[in-house]
């Protein structure tokens, strides 16, 4: 079995260098109807699709988010700029977190900062978080490269015809372990935040 993992790695690292996010100034300042929202999100996040037929967001998804308190309800069937920023958070979170966890994480944010007159706006939070994400790209590239090198050192004594597959399997396991540990940490942090929120409501 032949797998050109070096080309794949270079492709992944190259795509990491091109990672961008939807900047608030790119989000329309006028309220949008559902069809306009799905069209906008699909155009902006198309590069993150695994397969061309994948859907970024559908009407059903958005309705479910509103029903489950992940997204504040639209005003007269229209979605504001803040709605779209929340949808971006949901889009990234939903690949690793349950709907319940996303709700626990975002509800305090939307309750406090959505359409708020606070000094800190939802747009400010969005900008600050994604600014941090951009700063992590080089660190992430180095970490992935190191894991790749480690995986290439495994299964040296395996039959030659199986080595490439087994080394790739090893690389996937190394990456998966990292994801598993971080997911456990994220879930623990969300549980702590949720508990703090419940205790504050009791007071």
Q: What spans do the regions from the language model cover?
A:
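Intrinsically disordered, low-complexity, charge-dense segments enriched in Lys/Arg
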Residues: 108-203
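Basic helix-turn-helix/winged-helix DNA-binding cores
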Residues: 2-112
């Amino acid at each position: 079995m032949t797998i050109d993992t070096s080309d794949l790695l270079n492709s992944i690292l190259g795509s990491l260098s091109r990672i961008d996010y939807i900047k608030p100034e790119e989000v329309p300042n006028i309220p949008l109807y559902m069809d306009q929202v799905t069209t906008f999100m699909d155009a902006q996040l198309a590069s993150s699709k695994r397969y061309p037929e994948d859907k970024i967001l559908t009407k059903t998804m958005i309705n479910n988010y509103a029903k489950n308190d992940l997204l504040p309800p639209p005003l007269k069937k229209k979605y504001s700029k803040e709605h779209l920023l929340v949808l971006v958070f949901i889009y990234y979170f939903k690949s690793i977190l349950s709907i319940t966890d996303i709700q626990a994480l975002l509800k305090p944010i939307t309750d406090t900062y959505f359409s708020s007159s606070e000094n800190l706006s939802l747009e400010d939070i969005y900008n600050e978080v994604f600014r941090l994400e951009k700063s992590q790209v080089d660190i992430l590239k180095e970490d992935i490269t190191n894991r790749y090198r480690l995986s290439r050192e495994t299964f040296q004594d395996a039959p030659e015809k199986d080595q490439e597959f087994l080394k790739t399997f090893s690389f996937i396991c190394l990456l998966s372990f990292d994801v598993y540990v971080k997911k456990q940490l994220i879930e623990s942090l969300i549980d702590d935040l949720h508990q703090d929120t419940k205790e504050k409501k009791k007071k």
